[in-house]
Amino acid sequence: MTDKLIIFDTTLRDGEQSPGASMTKEEKIRIAKHLERMKVDVIEAGFAASSNGDFDAIHTIAGLVKDSTICSLARANDKDIQRAADALKPANSARIHTFIATSPLHMEKKLRMTPDQVFEQARLAVRFARKFTDNVEFSPEDGSRSDLDFLCRVLEAVIAEGATTINIADTVGYGVPELYGNLVKTLRERIPNSDKAIFSVHCHNDLGMAVANSLAGVKIGGARQVECTINGLGERAGNTSLEEIVMAVKTRKDYFGLDVGLDTTQIVPTSKLVSQITGFVVQPNKAVVGANAFAHASGIHQDGVLKARDTYEIMRAEDVGWTANKIVLGKLSGRNAFKQRLQELGVSLDSETELNAAFMRFKDLADRKSEIFDEDIIAIVSEESALAQEQEHYKFVSLSQRSETGEQPQAKVVFALDGKEVTGEARGNGPVDATFNAIEGEVGSGSELLLYSVNAITTGTQAQGEVTVRLSKSGRIVNGVGTDPDIVAASAKAYIAALNKLHSKDDKLNPQRS
């Protein structure tokens, strides 16, 4: 049995199924590059048969990412599997992940199939997938609520057909650690050919036990792959959190006895990127990546940490990518210094054009804000990278406001519509409301505002504001993000970014869950 734990990240597939977390192809590519930089073993880049957009994203990521295995989900039918294989053609290392439900409830109510039909479809699906790659994963959806004898029968058959990874899905988060761990152990013991495959765990967090169940599957059950997402992103209560799994196994190697090959210093930067793109803010007390994860307010704790860090810290903040807020550049800093700092932060841009645009944004910010922090630089680069890769139907130009006590504020927004400048003016219940009304008065998108959120990127009154706007139209939900020291300007940028995503519509098939 290998002493390495394989990390399978499904942020781009299962994580994206969280309502409001839909990502564009360009955003998926940015996250995939960060995951590769982190040395994630397997990246599930999407569900190729769900939409042309997902197919294109998988195909592009497969061509760009060379150091991680790229995976596509596929239902247990030839059409889905063929689509996955086509999307994965450019990959250095490709995996097809096929699945079918095996619980009595799912077979009867959802699939309307008999156990024998499910057995045959699972077996034939793996056989067909093996025509394209030797790396085939099979998941029995709702495996934790499946009949044990039937589950053993199905898994023995798919391993015989060539499945190299068997993923035990706790699809609805029903499992508890001891029972789930013993389920994985029992399957490995009872299935005669279980030694021919790596067993994997995939847990949801409906009862708050996704990480605990996954770790039990590893320790008790002998699983050697964990399926997880950055920040625990996922539908309902989310998925197993990658950062918590990795740091638990790494910090408690004395207990788990396993190695993880990830560069953990990339955890926090990747967490921040996913949070910014999806608009899902990380709670301050979230383990590993929360803002308070390494903060000590108690005087006793502070005294202990000052004397010896290991009195109250079992991990080092810098080991997961936390950096202290420090002034790094100023208005007199040149392009080379800016580029050098990007390299030190592990931030890459795809072209000199993007670098030049980011540098100009930096110089503009330095004229308006006396102290520039690493977080400011990362926010600038992230937004410029997104703008460079997105097709901008609308583009923010300028904003002016007027308000007086006792009167409704008025906003005037200038923005480009396919290269032609238009001006919108409106009043509202506040400056942000007036700004959105001014934009909407010219655009007439008919969208509904679902979320408006503001976060300070750094500390102090000069901090840049990062605004997330979530819009909904015709059942489609998109996020837009904008940053600026002026919160209202950041709001306008975020609203326009969301409108651009609505304009580039990609209809996606709602996949079955694993």
UniProtKB/Swiss-Prot annotation:
Its cofactor is Mn(2+). Keywords: Amino-acid biosynthesis, Branched-chain amino acid biosynthesis, Cytoplasm, Leucine biosynthesis, Manganese, Metal-binding, Transferase. PROSITE patterns: AIPM_HOMOCIT_SYNTH_1, AIPM_HOMOCIT_SYNTH_2, PYR_CT. Mn(2+) binds at D14, H202, H204, N239. Homodimer. Belongs to the alpha-IPM synthase/homocitrate synthase family. LeuA type 1 subfamily. This is 2-isopropylmalate synthase. It comes from Burkholderia ambifaria (strain MC40-6).
